[in-house]
Every structure is written in structure tokens, then in C-alpha cells.
């Protein structure tokens, strides 16, 4: 089946109707300051379309991982303040999610205005494994919309969660796919069906264990998988090399060895760095040097050395692979990009993506934060996903509850 779209909803007429929108406002904060407003900006078009059409918009969202109760540090206030600065319509924040404040604020909402309900994860029922508990919370959210409400899912970063505001609400209201979710799905389909080749995947980040399922599904589909980040050291260990004090998942070495064998049989090439930047300690000002990837313990720091970035030769080789591709998907930084001394590998990958003629997708999460932190603009890439975990699970071939419920 095909999901109904936002344009279909607007064509039906939304003036004066309460439209419940699940947005993605899960942004990084430094105290009360939003440090990356990419997801807020991405949520604006749908909210603007609805308010322009006269809808009374109720926004649900989460921030962080509160433990089922209100915590000031996880309030949506900073995100909503930024949203209000960017929006061309009135935006307010309710003091709670489904309590008296939310009900009163919703009742006083006017056509063309938006009300953001406080963090849905302040209510333990949002993420409950119990269907009845989640359903009860969803019923309270739906009650805010009155007799002629509708639901729009525009939070791609949450579609892999079977949560009340994502899944259960959609089963209780006429439901529609937001433009952001629609775009994300269309982009990711290009990575899984009729993909333009050569198809190069760049995988980084800390742990192999976080990427096992996506690696498994990419074998035989991707032409080349470039490996960086902390996970590269488990690949080096699988090839029989010592990695000193670098991050190593000992229990995944056998799994990686199996992947390498299967990939060779399936025609997928794994490319592992030939040089790495090794540091004396994990710190921004740590002494460091570049060494061959198969001789990490030969660095000045011996067995205490910690690999914190791919080396310049590897970065150049990876860039060449990217520039020769037709499709590129990147998920995970190549090193500790937050430290300037260990950001060169990640910067090189980002730069290569901006220079290739390939269709490029930056897979959300740390990768999206990295390109922005390093000074790249979103429009320099084909697409920057708003969903890190959701993007990976889509590429793993998993059914995503928040999408499947829209297709019912």
C-alpha cells in the first residue's frame, strides 16, 4: 500500500481542524542553547504548510532519553524557542504533554497557530512495551484533536520506534506521511533499489556492533565499503594486526572475519585504512603521529597508543573511491572530529562528497553533526538524513513501525 501524503490532507481542507504532527526536535544542546538546528529547520516546511492552510497544529516531539518523568534538562523549551525564531507563525509550548496545561492551551489555539506539547518521553507510557499503556497515552493525545482531527508523521528519526506518538496515534486517526518522511523514504529507496553504480558506502563511528546488521545487508549490494572510525580497529584485529590501546571489540573479531570472507565471495570490497593517526591519550591536545595501520604498536606510544583518526594516505584513497562513485552513503565519522587534531579524516570524506558527481547521502546522527561542525553547508550534499538509527534500520531491511502503520 501507499501512504497518504500531506498534500492530500491539505486538499481535503484543514482550516479550523486540529492536526497532530509528530516532528523531530531531538537536537543537541549546550545547556539551553541549540548547537545544531538542522532538525528544527527540517521540520518547518510541514508546520508552515499546515498553519498557512489554517490548521490548528499540535506538535509532539521528544528530546533525549528522560526516564518517563519530567526533567528540566530534557525540556523542549530551547528547541521551541529556536523554532519560534525561525517560524513565520505563532508557536507556543505547553507546560505538559496531556495534562491540564496542554488541554487548556489546545482549546485556546487559533487557526494558523502551532502548540508544541512538552517532551512526550516525560510520560513513561510513550515508550512502554505494553500495548495497552501506549494505547492509553495515544488516546489522550488524540483527544486533544477533537472530532475531526488528523495525524501527520514528519519525524523520520523516530519511525523505527514503536512508540505511542509515532505508532499508536497513527492507528487512531486518519494518518498522513509528512514531506520530510516522504523525502527520506524516497532517498533511501535509491540506496536499496535501482542504485546507480559504483555504489560506495562509508562506515565509521565507534563500534562495529552498532553496524552489524547494516553491514550484513550491504554485502552483495554495495560495490565498496570504506571502513573508518573506531570500528576500523576491530577490522584490523580481524586481519591479524595489533591495535595497541585503540578501541577494540574482541567479541566481534570472528564476525568481522566472516563478513570479509562473505564479501569477497559476493563481490563487495572492504577497504581498510593503511595508515592511522595514533595519540598518546584521548584528549584534544594529545601528542600524536601517523603510522602504518599494520604497525600501530611501532608508534612512539607503543602498546599505549590510541588510534583516533584515519591517516592522510587513507583519507586520500577513500576520497578517490568516492569521486569515482555514482552513489555514496556515509554513516559515521572517520575519527574524533570534535578534536581538531583528529578531524582531518572526517573533513576529507565530507570534502570528497561535495566534489563527486555521485548522488550523496549523509546518514544522519554524528555524520550530520560532523559536516556542520566542520563548516559544510547542507546544500553541498545530495541529502542529509534526519534519522541516524532509522536510516540504518531501513538499510538493514527492517520493517519500521512508524512507516508500516501509515501504509495500513
Swiss-Prot record:
Pathway: Carbohydrate degradation; glycolysis; pyruvate from D-glyceraldehyde 3-phosphate: step 2/5. It catalyses: (2R)-3-phosphoglycerate + ATP = (2R)-3-phospho-glyceroyl phosphate + ADP. It is found in: Cytoplasm. Keywords: ATP-binding, Cytoplasm, Glycolysis, Kinase, Nucleotide-binding, Transferase. The keyword Transferase applies. Substrate binds at residues 24-26, 39, 62-65, 121, 161. GO terms for molecular function: ADP binding; ATP binding; phosphoglycerate kinase activity. Disulfide bonds: none annotated. ATP binds at residues 211, 307, 338, 364-367. GO terms for cellular component: cytosol. Its main location: cytoplasm. Coiled coil: none annotated. One of its GO terms (biological process) is glycolytic process. It is an enzyme of class 2 (transferase). Its EC number is 2.7.2.3. The keyword ATP-binding applies. Belongs to the phosphoglycerate kinase family. Monomer. PANTHER family: PHOSPHOGLYCERATE KINASE, PHOSPHOGLYCERATE KINASE 1, CHLOROPLASTIC-RELATED. This is Phosphoglycerate kinase. It comes from Pseudarthrobacter chlorophenolicus (strain ATCC 700700 / DSM 12829 / CIP 107037 / JCM 12360 / KCTC 9906 / NCIMB 13794 / A6).
